[in-house]
Curated annotation (Swiss-Prot):
Stated family: Belongs to the TrpA family.
One GO molecular-function entry: tryptophan synthase activity
Protein name, per record: Tryptophan synthase alpha chain
Gene3D superfamilies in the record: Aldolase class I
Pfam family, one: Trp_syntA
Subunit and interaction comment: Tetramer of two alpha and two beta chains.
Keyword Secreted: no
Amino acid sequence: MIINIHINFFMTTISSVFKKLDKQCALIPFITAGDPDLVSTSKALKILDQHGADIIELGLPYSDPLADGPIIQAASSRALKQSINLNNILDMVNITSSNIVAPIVLFTYYNPVLNLGINNFISAISRAGIKGLLIPDLPIEESDYIISVCKLFNIELIFLLSPTSSIERINKIVEQAPGCIYLVSTTGVTGQKPELTGKLKRLTETIKKMTQKPIILGFGISTAEQIKEIKGWNINGIVIGSAFVKRLSSDFPEEGLRKIKDFCTTAKSIIIS
């Protein structure tokens, strides 16, 4: 893999975003790389950065996305049919990241990391300008080495925490997580869910008492009502995925870009209001 390096003096780190926002909630949109095409993905990253995104999550298309709902699965399938892969995604990110401030988190399953080799994978995404990494199927019991490699390359590894986790499991993840913790809002896959629960709110309160590490919430958040509710939970970030992916997958790329711009602007205005 050969990447021409474009040094980015503007993109911030994930931890610095949370420090800057202090108690304000970060807006974290998710989009799938290569859907509808890589040119549109590059434009989408810039649009999201310019219209309220504090951090941007970029999904690496994968053939067996167990944690993804139907909207994101379909987006991955469309991207893979165009021969979108890690190499051309990182080439695009390398060029685009020099024009944006919001740090990019790469969402990928563990298998692509293992196929390339942990050191090679982390080195490659770091050179391209990626600032964070989220691996939903990474077993915490196998995470020590990848944590050390991420630290070496200044990549912030984000751990997932399920709402069904035992207290013992929560303690282990909270203690081992090198940075922010991604709390899954519902059991099952990603997607647009109608409501959130009081149990989830109580869980966020419990975790906040256990750690000073930033807590972000995602999976199933898609409406203005949900954003309004969650921003009052004293969490550090809201991840919105399927709602952005669905809008971006419009019949015409420019229409999709307009839709995500409008939705990003709306979501940010709700958070800061």
